[in-house]
Structure formats: structure tokens, C-alpha cells
């Protein structure tokens, strides 16, 4: 409204004009979406591994997709890893580390809940008020004792989302009241393909069949060595002296060791060096003990990325059907003759073995890789903002 005496806008008119102009300015300015800050909890060296990944010396899938998720507007606060032999001391340290940084993140992403238990209980009691998303490496089960089941139910209330490697774990978890379907997410965990592309550039193919076993968790080394004892083919074993209560040195030294079997004891986490060695072999062998989870999956996805055929124990928790996909041969648990036959088949059919390797690589490129599962994880974690 105009003041007819002064011919100048009234105060109300000025306010309206200013508001309109301000609205036009705001519309023209594209306000960037703020990144979601997430606390990244890992059970091994975190920042150091990330820096190695940036240099191409560490595979990103062992960081459980953290580098890939940065593409989707997630900024990570790294957990300051420290090793503790005592589980209680670990839990207390993790609790202090999380509470100290609580104001700097909106959610927690964990590769395992080991060490995070006190944080999860606080969240369940409403004292932390922070969404927690964690990988669950086995199925959620119901305790036989009510005194164990009751605190367990409280514990799982503190977790907003769980990521699983295979559908079988989800199906088994759904039998428990602690695992409602909306909390369970199947993720196509797979290799950091560009990392292995760099490895393969300098790798050379063996002139004779070379079989290799890596990994240290629940491996059936006894069956594997017995299978190779009467075969002419070379087997290289890379394994820790002891892991998870199994003394592999003792197991190996109790077996006859012919000249075609070479054993190398490893220390620490050396994925880059092991990948270089595996890339120059003919076939990856994964002898597993019978446990209800994805024993050997890390070794398996590495073989996919390197385009190598597989011989594995028939682990029904693997996310893919190895025989059906045509990427290798599976053998029943503890079947020495079955292993020997599979090795002879791969060695005697090199063209078919190469085809298995090509199909394995294609599976990594299309389905099981860090680009795919990083996006899947980010979609779940980012969903709380929508």
C-alpha cells in the first residue's frame, strides 16, 4: 500500500518487497545437501588401512565398503582402533571412544558388534539415541536359557539394522523374535575390483598347475594335505600358525608333507602381498571346516576378482552356488578322495578351468563387488534421513 502524501512505500509494503526479493535469492542459490556423519567402527586398524587403500595397497572391501559409501554423501568419523586381549577392556575402551565423539556423528556403522556391546545396550535403554547398523556374521539365534535370552532381546533392540552376507542367515534369523524382517538386509559383499585390476597388471601365468590355499579361519588343512599327498600337483599353503583356537602348525606337522606341498606361515594382515601371490596361481582351494557361517568367503571373492577357478568345501552358507554358476567345484566336508578328484579334474582340463575363471570374474563385475554393496549399504544408512 502506498502513502499518498509522501509517495513512498509504507512499512508493510517495504517488508513485502524485501521478503519477495529474499525468496528469489534463496531460490537461485542451490544449497548443498549436508553430508551425513557416521562413526565407522572396525575390529582392525581403520585409518591406517584407509590410507593404504588410497595408495592402492589395501582392498576396500576389507573396509566393508566404507570408501565406496563416501560417494553417497556419507562422511565417516574413524574409530581409533586399539587391540585388547580382554573382551571387557575392549568394550570399555570402545564405549569411552564413542561417548567422547558422540557430538560429531549421527549414526554408527560397524563391521561387527564385537566390542560394541556396551554401546548397543546403552542405545537399547534410550541413553545414546543413535541409529546403529552392524554386520552380523552368523544367524541371529534364540538362547536355550531364558536368563540369556532376555538380555539378548534387550541387546538387539539397540540395533537399527543388520547386514548379512547370505540369504540363508536371514532365513534362519527370522525364526527369532529378536530379528524382525525390517532390520535384516542382504548385501552382495564382494571384492574391490579396481584393487585387483592393479594386481593383475603385473601378474604372470604359471607354466604348470599351481593350487593355492590362503585364509586362516576354520580351515580343514588336514583333509587338503591328505588329498594332495599322492598327487603330482603343486600346493602352496599360506596360513597363520594359530587362529581361533586351532594350532595349524601342529596340524601340519602331524601330516606327511611331500615335496609338492609348500607351507608358508603368515603374520598380520597382508592382503596386497597375498593377492600378488594368488594372482600367479592356477586355482584357489578353500578347505573349510563345517561351521554355520560363510567360512572362506574372503578368499572366495578374491578368486572372483582375479578370475581364478575354485575348489571349495560345500559350504551352503556361501551367497552363490559355485557349481551352478560354473565357477568351480565343491566337495563334501572332509572328503579326501573328492578333493583329489576335483584337483585332478582342474589340472586335466585347463581350458574348462579358464572358462570357470572367466565366469568368476564376470560374477564379480556384475553382482558381487564393492561398488554394488557400497551402494546397498548407503541406501540403508541414508534412509534414516528421508
Regions picked out by a protein language model, each given a short descriptive name:
Residues 83, 131-146:
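A short, histidine- and acid-enriched strand-loop-helix "catalytic/donor-clamping" loop
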Residues 239, 248-278:
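Nucleotide-activated donor-binding/catalytic signature segment of Leloir-type glycosyltransferases, i.e.
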Residues 96-103, 143-163:
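Membrane-proximal helix-turn-helix segments that form the acceptor-binding/catalytic region
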Residues 345, 352-366, 376-379:
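A short, well-ordered alpha-helix in the C-terminal region of glycosyltransferases
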Residues 174-175, 183-185, 191-208, 222:
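Acidic anion/phosphate-binding donor-loop and adjacent secondary structure
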Residues 278-293, 308:
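Acidic donor-binding loop of glycosyltransferase active sites
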Residues 324-336, 345-351:
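Conserved acidic donor-binding segment of nucleotide-sugar-dependent glycosyltransferases
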Residues 202-219, 224-236:
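Conserved donor-binding/catalytic core segment of Leloir-type glycosyltransferases
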